[in-house]
């Protein structure tokens, strides 16, 4: 349908909705109009439609619709490069999504904001925009992983991840982080192929192709871009395909293949462009390429017979390349012109002009010394012409300046140029020389500049010389304009080739680089060097391969990158083709050509996860010791593949990968991995392996063979998870046009897809398409009659349903190529006559048209569940089986009945099965059933559309609540108990649905409670879903602790993969008060899982994450995941000790403190804090600590803070509330003598409430203790003091402390002096003071003597009052008053 026709239809439907007062329907149609207009580059008109949509949503009180309208307005403004306004609307979208607690829209909002920042970077190259884009995309990805995992269908989650991976890949490419860029692109391509996301696959391949092109990797770029072009062709997106052709033409020009570039540009021109500036650029580039092709053809003809003409053509080529900025080819053309000139012995002046052209071009290439050499040659050839010599000497001087030569080399050149200009009596040239000389002197020799400036002022310019210069410039301009006009005429003369038929163009592309030369029919190649056998292996055409080999096609030809047909068959997983090629002598261990990096067919198969192919190669003697250029053996290739795609592999694929690993290990150790004898290739070949015929002729397949064709065998041989490798596994992007057959997303239901490590090749669409193409008749005849009858009955049951049961149709543009389906019953049982009559013309369901974009560099932001907002949906057409009469009028598909649904509703409603076998063949159908009732049920953030089937028993509200609960359980893994409300009114469970609800009504479901299985079962289910084995110690902990108030899994050294199922099992453990995970390996990557679990634990009061390898990035994720939620609102104790947080975590720590308003204990021992701690984020941290009103205990021990950092820290602490402060070993070194000053100032603060102070291991001495004693009277609340492990504290300090305590109202409840230099004997009087002022004293010193122990023993019975106890063991002496 044409654009104008679609616009008219939508505008008509919009006007009808407006007259009917249906604001939601009108808003939905405004949305569709805006999307349609934007898809064709009419952004201003699209923006107006989205503004109307926003106003209608606001009037209809639809907050979610308003949010989406803001997003679309922001996207249109970004496309119009009004980025501040775009970000304003996108942040409004974010706020609305946040207020609605709609995680799906939150994910989209962050992705959209990230995309806009990426556009800003493209516009102004701001690194800050890149960092903001990265942060936004990471937030969006975290929401997908933490909030949406388990709540949406896996296909939608994969679509979201696909686009976010692509956006992150683009971001890291701009940040020049190549490794991360490549990883994200590979993940994006894998998920896009796995889920048939053609538009996202197009973007990923297109952008990866341009990245390879900019990096000079032309072979990889061509394959990625060809894959992108095929995706665009599959989607029937002409503008996207045109952009691919333009970039392909650029790559081909870089490679020097202008003939192929011409074909690509002509195709781009015919396909059209979305923007006029793009079309103008294509025209300009096409004119250039056409001119180059014409001149190259003329040069080829003239080289042998007309050297004079060839010399002229070389000059024209050089000028053409130079004008286009292709300076290396321009220099090459001028060099060839110079050789012809020397061959023809042309005059010196003529050759001098060629040297000038070469020098100028080398200067443009920054080869300034090379330019000087050609200027010197020009000088030699122009000897005696002082004017030309002057200009040449000036050029030499300027080139030497550009090369960075010293002033001593520049000055003589300028002087000679000035002298020649004076001899030629050219004042204007003299002035020019002096101006350049003056500029150089100011920079390199300032003392000589005044003299030159004086000469410049004295020099006058003659009027006639000015006129002469102007005349020369005018002549040069006219010449340039004449050249441009000639090029336009030239391009117009080439337009007659645009009428080529598609078949002729295909033949032209197949011949590719052969040009006019004749070659063998087996040497016909396309632009990538692929032969007919390559293409047949890529497309999986077994019979075509057999025919080619039987006719003598070489078995081992290479394409231009170096791949052989066997590589291709292994790459695409065509098992039977691999078997056939090996049977006929294909080289099993071929390492490929120059561009293949030593990848053998076995590496190739393992790199794509085709384990059956790899097993066959091993049977046939493939080497397991050969390594790629990166040093990878086949076993290491498999391990790398598993590591990359571990998260996306299903359990069956993991098992197969383990089995293949064992097989490779057995083969590497010399054991025979198979019972059958391995196939051995001949030790020598008589002919070149690239051109030798097959070793044995290909036998004709017997007509009565019982062996199933390839596709059938694939289904029989492998498990459902691997059935039909052409459709169940994504292929590498590679190669040219896809076959004419169609593809469908619906086929993926055959089993879980498997990932493939991709080398940069073009589209796998051909193979995916082939998976949808019905097989030959023999395939269909192999099915049994019972299977046919079962399929027939299932099809009949589906006819006449209220809703269409058709799965997603094939991509647009390929529906005509589908072969007709085979009959559902055997021929011998077929009824005579036409017994099936349709009440409407047969039509084929088509997929909704994917959203397009004008700029494919622009990353996508929306998720996969956005279909109802951006694509018009057509009502599924019904086909009824009639017996007595047929309907004369076809059913028209009116405007979409679901177009007015709010975003988030399922795009395809569920349909219940009709009861009974009412549609048996031969029975007339009764009257058509009434239309079904469909009810929308909102359960928290999820909206379900539930059909109520017609039956003899009318369903009740209780049935509807149960259906909604079951759907929520399937989506989220949690089973709620629900009550239903309609517009605030509570619906009674016993009421019948038709009595209280109408079709399309929306009811609100309130969760009264959750039906949670035991924690052990939840842990086991989580392990199964993640493909992770159960950890026995964790299982014991789960069984013992169950759903109690505390859970501990300490010191188990659990890694991230082992912690993930545990954290998921603990979700919604609402009664949990204490969670202890100390001594594990949480790391930064598992924090997202932790945050998701913490969000469901509202009662959590203690969280211990000590010694968990948590870094600054992990702390940042933890802090970012908490604000705005109820997470950790009840947390009272947090332990982050022994994690390498570092000085840069200040902002994250501040956010964490703000997110925990009731926090009373914070432990940060040994976190790697240093002197810079508190420096970069002093304001944020200070504010956070001051606002921590409930903080009672803070431990910063074992962090080498030093005096300055400690001072900043203590200055920010709340002195009036903090009771317990641990500062053990915080000195930066032994010489940190000022450490106690900030402590003294803190203790002297008015209202200081500190009760416990630990200062152990800080290199303190008696002087520090004396100063501390002065503060004891200022801080009467201090009752516990630990000064242990300070070996410079002596007995004098103890006496000083006891004397000070006598002046206080109360003594100390604890004094720690272990590891100090307290030396005995202390004397009986000192022991009396100890007993009077201290409730507990710890001494641990080798310097105590026997008299001290005797004095303590004598002291105990003589004192009345509370009892006392002592511990005297070796050097330890502990005293406590009970």
From Swiss-Prot:
Comp. bias (Low complexity): 736-753, 777-789
Modified residues (Phosphoserine): 719
Record remark on domains: The ANK repeats mediate the interaction with the MCM complex and histones, while the LRR repeats mediate the interaction with MMS22L.
Residue windows of the LRR repeats: 1069-1093, 1097-1122, 1128-1151, 1188-1212, 1247-1270, 1275-1300, 1331-1354
Record protein name field: Tonsoku-like protein
List of residues that carry Omega-N-methylarginine: 797
Expression across tissues: Expressed in heart, skeletal muscle and tracheal epithelial cells.
TPR repeats: 27-60, 67-100, 107-147, 162-195, 202-235, 242-275, 311-344, 352-385
Organism encoding this protein: Homo sapiens (Human)
Result for mutant: residue 42 to H: In SEMDSP; uncertain significance
Annotated Basic residues bias: 514-523
Subunit structure: Component of the MMS22L-TONSL complex, a complex at least composed of MMS22L and TONSL/NFKBIL2. Interacts with the MCM complex, the FACT complex and the RPA complex. Interacts with MCM5; the interaction is direct. Binds histones, with a strong preference for histone H3.1 (histones H3.1 and H3-4/H3.1t). Interacts (via ANK repeats) with histone H4; specifically binds histone H4 lacking methylation at 'Lys-20' (H4K20me0). May interact with DNAJC9; the interaction seems to be histone-dependent.
One Gene Ontology MF term: histone reader activity
GO CC aspect terms: cytoplasm; nuclear body; nuclear replication fork; nucleoplasm; site of double-strand break
Effect of residue 1090 to R: In SEMDSP; uncertain significance
């Amino acid at each position: 349908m044409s654009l104008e026709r679609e616009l008219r239809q939508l505008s008509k439907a919009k006007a009808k909705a407006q007259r009917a007062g249906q604001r939601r329907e009108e808003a939905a149609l405004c949305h569709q109009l805006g999307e349609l207009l934007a898809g064709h580059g009419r952004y201003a008109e699209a923006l107006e439609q989205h503004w109307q949509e926003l106003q209608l949503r606001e009037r209809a009180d639809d907050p979610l619709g308003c949010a989406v309208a803001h997003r679309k307005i922001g996207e249109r403004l970004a496309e119009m490069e009004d980025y501040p306004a775009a970000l304003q609307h996108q942040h409004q979208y974010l706020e609305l999504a946040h207020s609605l607690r709609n995680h799906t829209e939150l994910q989209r909002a962050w992705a959209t904001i990230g995309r806009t920042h990426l556009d800003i970077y493209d516009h102004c190259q701001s690194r800050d925009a890149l960092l903001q884009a990265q942060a936004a995309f990471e937030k969006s990805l975290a929401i997908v992983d933490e909030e949406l995992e388990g709540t949406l269908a896996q296909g939608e989650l994969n679509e979201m991840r696909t686009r976010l991976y692509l956006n992150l890949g683009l971001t890291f490419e701009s940040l020049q982080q190549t490794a991360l860029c490549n990883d994200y692109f590979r993940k994006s391509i894998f998920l896009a192929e796995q889920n048939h996301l053609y538009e996202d696959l197009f973007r990923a391949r297109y952008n990866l192709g341009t990245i390879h092109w900019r990096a000079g990797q032309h072979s990889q770029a061509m394959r990625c871009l060809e894959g992108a072009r095929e995706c665009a062709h599959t989607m029937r997106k002409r503008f996207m395909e045109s952009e691919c052709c333009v970039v392909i033409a650029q790559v081909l020009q870089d490679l020097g293949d202008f003939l192929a570039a011409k074909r690509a540009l002509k195709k781009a021109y015919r396909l059209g462009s979305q923007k006029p500036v793009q079309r103008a650029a294509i025209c300009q580039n096409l004119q250039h390429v056409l001119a180059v092709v014409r001149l190259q053809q003329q040069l080829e003809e003239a080289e042998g017979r007309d050297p004079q003409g060839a010399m002229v053509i070389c000059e024209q080529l050089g000028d053409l390349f130079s004008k286009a900025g292709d300076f290396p080819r321009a220099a090459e053309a001028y060099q060839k012109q110079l050789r012809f000139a020397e061959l023809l012995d042309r005059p010196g002046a003529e050759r001098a002009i060629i040297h000038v052209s070469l020098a100028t071009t080398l200067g443009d290439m920054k080869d300034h010394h090379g330019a000087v050499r050609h200027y010197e040659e020009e000088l030699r050839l122009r000897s005696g012409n002082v004017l030309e010599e002057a200009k040449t000497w000036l050029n030499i001087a300027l080139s030497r300046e550009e090369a960075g030569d010293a002033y001593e080399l520049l000055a003589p050149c300028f002087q000679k140029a000035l002298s020649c200009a004076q001899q030629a009596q050219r004042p204007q040239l003299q002035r020019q020389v002096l101006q350049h000389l003056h500029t150089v002197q100011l920079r390199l020799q300032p003392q000589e500049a005044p003299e030159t400036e004086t000469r410049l002022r004295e020099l006058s310019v003659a009027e006639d010389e000015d006129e002469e210069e102007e005349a020369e410039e005018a002549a040069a301009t006219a010449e340039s304009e004449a050249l441009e006009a000639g090029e336009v005429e030239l391009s117009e003369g080439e337009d007659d080739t645009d009428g080529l038929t598609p078949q002729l163009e295909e033949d032209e592309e197949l011949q590719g680089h052969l040009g006019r030369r004749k070659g063998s029919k087996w040497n016909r190649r396309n632009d990538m060097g692929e032969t007919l056998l390559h293409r047949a292996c890529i497309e999986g055409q077994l019979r075509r391969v057999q025919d080619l080999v039987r006719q003598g096609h070489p078995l081992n030809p290479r394409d231009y990158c170096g791949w052989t047909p066997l590589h291709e068959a292994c790459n695409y997983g065509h098992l039977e083709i691999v078997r056939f090629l090996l049977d006929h002598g294909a080289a099993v261990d071929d390492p490929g050509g120059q561009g293949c990096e030593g990848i053998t067919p076995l590496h190739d198969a393992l790199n794509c996860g085709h384990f059956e192919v790899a097993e066959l190669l091993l049977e046939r003697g493939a080497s397991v010791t050969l390594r790629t250029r990166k040093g990878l053996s086949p076993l290491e290739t498999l391990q790398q593949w598993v590591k990359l795609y571990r998260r996306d592999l299903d359990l069956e694929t993991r098992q197969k990968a383990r089995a293949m690993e064992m097989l490779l290990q057995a083969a590497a150790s010399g054991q025979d991995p198979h019972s059958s004898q391995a196939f051995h290739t001949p030790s020598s070949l008589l002919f070149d392996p690239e051109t030798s015929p097959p070793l044995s002729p290909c036998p004709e397949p017997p007509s009565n063979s019982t062996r199933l064709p390839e596709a059938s065998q694939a289904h029989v041989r492998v498990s459902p998870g691997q059935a039909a490798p052409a459709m169940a596994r994504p292929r590498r992007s590679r190669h040219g046009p896809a076959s004419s057959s169609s593809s469908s997303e619906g086929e993926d239901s055959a089993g879980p897809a498997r990932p493939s490590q991709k080398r940069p090749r073009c589209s796998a669409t051909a193979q995916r398409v082939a998976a949808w193409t019905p097989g030959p008749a023999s395939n269909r005849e192999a099915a049994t009659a019972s299977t046919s009858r079962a399929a027939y009955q299932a099809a009949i049951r589906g006819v006449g349903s209220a809703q269409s049961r058709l799965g997603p149709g094939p991509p647009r543009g390929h529906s005509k190529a589908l072969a007709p389906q085979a009959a559902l019953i055997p021929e011998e049982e077929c009824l005579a006559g036409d017994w099936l009559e349709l009440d409407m013309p047969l039509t084929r369901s088509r997929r909704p048209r994917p959203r397009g974009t004008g700029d494919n560099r622009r990353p996508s932001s929306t998720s996969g569940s956005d279909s109802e907002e951006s694509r018009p949906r057509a009502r599924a057409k019904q086909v009824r089986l009639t017996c007595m009469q047929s309907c004369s009028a076809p059913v028209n598909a009116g405007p979409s009945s679901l177009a007015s649904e709010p975003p988030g509703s399922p795009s395809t409603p569920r349909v219940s099965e009709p009861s009974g076998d009412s549609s048996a063949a031969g029975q007339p159908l009764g009257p058509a059933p009434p239309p079904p009732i469909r009810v929308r049920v909102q359960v928290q953030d999820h909206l379900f559309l539930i059909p109520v089937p017609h039956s003899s028993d009318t369903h009740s509200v209780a049935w509807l609540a149960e259906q909604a609960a079951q759907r929520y359980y399937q989506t989220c893994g949690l089973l709620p108990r629900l009550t239903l409300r309609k517009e605030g009114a509570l619906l009674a469970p016993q009421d019948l649905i038709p009595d209280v609800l109408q079709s399309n009504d929306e009811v609100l479901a309130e969760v009264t409670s959750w039906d949670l299985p035991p924690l052990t079962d939840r842990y086991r289910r989580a392990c199964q879903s993640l493909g992770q084995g159960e950890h026995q110690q964790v299982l014991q902990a789960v069984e013992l602790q169950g759903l109690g108030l505390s859970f501990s899994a300490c010191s188990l050294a659990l890694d991230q993969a082992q912690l993930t199922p545990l954290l998921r099992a603990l979700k919604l453990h609402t009664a949990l008060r204490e969670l202890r995970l100390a001594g594990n390996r949480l790391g930064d990557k598992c924090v997202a899982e932790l945050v998701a679990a913490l969000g469901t634990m509202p009662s959590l009061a203690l969280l211990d994450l000590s010694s968990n390898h948590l870094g600054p990035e992990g702390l940042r994720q933890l802090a970012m995941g908490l604000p705005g939620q109820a997470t950790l609102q009840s947390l009272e104790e947090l332990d982050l000790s022994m994690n390498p947080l570092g000085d840069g975590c200040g902002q994250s720590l501040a956010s964490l403190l703000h997110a925990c308003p009731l926090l009373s204990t914070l432990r940060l021992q040994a976190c790697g804090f240093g002197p810079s701690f508190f420096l970069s984020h002093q304001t944020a941290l200070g504010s956070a600590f001051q606002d921590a009103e409930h903080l009672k205990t803070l431990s910063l021990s074992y962090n080498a803070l030093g005096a300055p950092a400690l001072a900043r820290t203590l200055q920010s602490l709340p002195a009036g509330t903090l009771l317990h402060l641990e500062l053990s070993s915080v000195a930066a070194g032994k010489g940190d003598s000022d450490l106690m000053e900030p402590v003294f100032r803190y203790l002297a603060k008015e209202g200081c409430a500190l009760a416990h102070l630990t200062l152990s291991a800080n290199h303190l001495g008696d002087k520090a203790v004396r100063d501390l004693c002065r503060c004891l009277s200022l801080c009467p609340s201090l009752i516990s003091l630990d000064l242990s492990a300070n070996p410079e504290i002596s007995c004098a300090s103890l006496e000083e402390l006891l004397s000070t305590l006598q002046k206080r109202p109360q003594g100390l409840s604890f004094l720690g002096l272990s590891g100090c230099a307290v030396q005995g004997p202390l004397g009986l009087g000192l022991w009396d003071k100890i007993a009077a002022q201290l409730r507990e004293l710890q001494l641990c010193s080798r310097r105590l003597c026997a008299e001290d122990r005797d004095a303590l023993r004598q002291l105990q019975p003589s004192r009345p009052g509370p009892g006392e106890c002592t511990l005297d063991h070796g050097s330890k002496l502990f005293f406590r008053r009970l």
